[in-house]
Amino acid sequence: DVYKRQYEAYTELYRVSKDAAVKEKLCWILDVFAEKVYNPKKQRQEVFFDKNYNSIIDLHSYGHDIETAWLIDRGVEILGEEAYAEKMSPITEALTAQIYHVAFNGHSLANECDKGVVNTHRIWWVQAETVIGFLNGYEKQPEHLEYKDAALAEWEFIKNFQMDKRAGSEWFWEVDENGVPYPDRPIVEPWKCPYHNGRMCMEIIKRIK
């Protein structure tokens, strides 16, 4: 997750500065992702590595993959290098397709798969990134109407179940696949803030206006 946050920050820094050193780092991160982080056989990104970039855990993080797909596309767009568009676009398309087929159940996205065992909890940030990720996939490949439908269905799930409708509240940290909240999770704490869901709202507004 660290490289992705660096990439996200460098993307916006390069957008406003066009600094050559920042561009160099963006390209380096994309190269590392394509050559070390992305697993083409499993069409997913690996999560934890040793110092030589060997994967050390069998974990498919569905939320990180759908988030990464649109973040990479955004960075490549801002980078403006055709070679990187050709290199990265097939990867982000594969990530989006794989998540749609293995993790989306028609209305929301499961959390992750750890050593073959799927965690079906619906985590607040995963649901937020799902809306952006599938809308991004549809914008890139408008023939894939299922991505548009998935983004709309996810948004309905969020409104009906992920949002805590109590006055002054926020989104539930997690609910089960039927939308029932887990009561032991706080609404806000150091690992739970409105970053992902706030960004989702702003991102969707920009994309559909």
Locations of the language-model features?
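Glycan-recognition and catalytic cores of secretory/periplasmic carbohydrate-active enzymes
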Residues: 1-209
